Amino acid sequence: MDWTWRILFLVAAATGAHSQVQLVQSGAEVKKPGASVKVSCKASGYTFTGYYMHWVRQAPGQGLEWMGWINPNSGGTNYAQKFQGWVTMTRDTSISTAYMELSRLRSDDTAVYYCAR
């Protein structure tokens, strides 16, 4: 199974209309080049620590790009090579929320960012 298919499935699963699972993300932000941004993803309807949380992004006119995952139970992470040293994924189990922070922003980081269970 290739990653393209998996990413498409993960995004679809996160937004499925028939599921009680909800992932609610923070709103849109505008940042200057060189700044950092931290996106939150609050989970409900399932055991937060029982599933890895993935992050993907989609730049205008581009396909989906997998950024990495965090294990909410242990806090362990796995980042795509492109994002290593540049992205930080964390979680707060007390509020069932995952976070993705991207530093040293560039203009080509303009994208829609998704969390996906």
Curated annotation (Swiss-Prot):
Region (Complementarity-determining-2) spans which residues? Answer: 70-77
Its domain of life reads: Eukaryota
PROSITE patterns from the xrefs? IG_LIKE
* Framework-2 as annotated region, ranges: 53-69
Main location as per UniProt: secreted
Residue ranges for the region (Complementarity-determining-1) are 45-52
- SUPFAM superfamilies recorded: Immunoglobulin (SSF48726)
- Signal sequence span is 1-19
Query: Which residues does this entry mark as bearing Pyrrolidone carboxylic acid?
Result: 20
Effect on the protein of changing residue 69 to R:
In IMGT allele IGHV1-2*01
Compartmental location = Secreted; Cell membrane
Enumerate the residue ranges of region (Framework-3).
78-115
What residues form the membrane-spanning segments? none
Q: A GO CC term? A: immunoglobulin complex
Chain spans, region Framework-1: 20-44
UniProtKB keywords: Adaptive immunity, Cell membrane, Disulfide bond, Immunity, Immunoglobulin, Immunoglobulin domain, Membrane, Pyrrolidone carboxylic acid, Secreted, Signal
| Region of interest called Complementarity-determining-3, as start-end residue ranges on this chain | 116-117
What Gene Ontology terms for biological process does this UniProt record contain?
Answer: immune response; immunoglobulin mediated immune response
| Sequence ranges assigned to domain Ig-like in this UniProt record | 20-117
Task: Name the InterPro entries on file.
Answer: Ig-like_dom, Ig-like_dom_sf, Ig-like_fold, Ig_V-set, IgHV
Q: What does this protein do?
A: V region of the variable domain of immunoglobulin heavy chains that participates in the antigen recognition. Immunoglobulins, also known as antibodies, are membrane-bound or secreted glycoproteins produced by B lymphocytes. In the recognition phase of humoral immunity, the membrane-bound immunoglobulins serve as receptors which, upon binding of a specific antigen, trigger the clonal expansion and differentiation of B lymphocytes into immunoglobulins-secreting plasma cells.
Q: How does it assemble?
A: Immunoglobulins are composed of two identical heavy chains and two identical light chains; disulfide-linked.
The name this protein carries in UniProt is Immunoglobulin heavy variable 1-2
